[in-house]
């Protein structure tokens, strides 16, 4: 839920949001996110994380272009502020 709205998340979006929520306030690198959400045997591009972050922002941010919940930490990764 986001306020009174029920969010419709895809399974991987849910896993990503859950993982980030469990590490609120911590900077998480793409590699760490990939390992914990997609698994150590994931074959693909780390930009997969960026795409899923963008999809989540579109669903949970009031203004996805100026996010307040999922923050990009330039050169490091992402931080979830809740």
Predicted regions and their residues:
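A structural micro-motif at secondary-structure boundaries
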Residues: 1-14, 41, 79-82
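ABC transporter nucleotide-binding domain catalytic core, centered on the Walker B motif
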Residues: 3, 38, 74
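DNA-binding patch around the recognition helix
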Residues: 8, 53-82
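The N-cap/first-turn positions of alpha helices
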Residues: 13-16, 30
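Hydrophobic residues on short alpha-helical segments
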Residues: 17-18, 34, 54
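Short helix-capping/hinge SLiMs at alpha-helix to coil transitions
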Residues: 22-25, 40
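Short coil-to-helix segment of the ABC ATPase nucleotide-binding domain corresponding to the Q-loop/switch region
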Residues: 26-37
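Residues within helix-turn-helix
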Residues: 31, 47, 54
């Amino acid at each position: 839920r986001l306020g009174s709205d029920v969010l419709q998340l895809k399974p991987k979006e849910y896993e990503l949001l859950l993982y980030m929520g469990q590490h609120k306030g911590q900077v998480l690198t793409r590699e760490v996110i990939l390992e914990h959400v997609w698994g150590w045997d994931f074959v693909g591009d780390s930009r997969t994380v960026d795409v899923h972050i963008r999809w989540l922002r579109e669903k949970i941010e009031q203004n996805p272009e100026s996010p307040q919940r999922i923050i990009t930490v330039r050169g490091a990764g992402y931080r979830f502020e809740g």
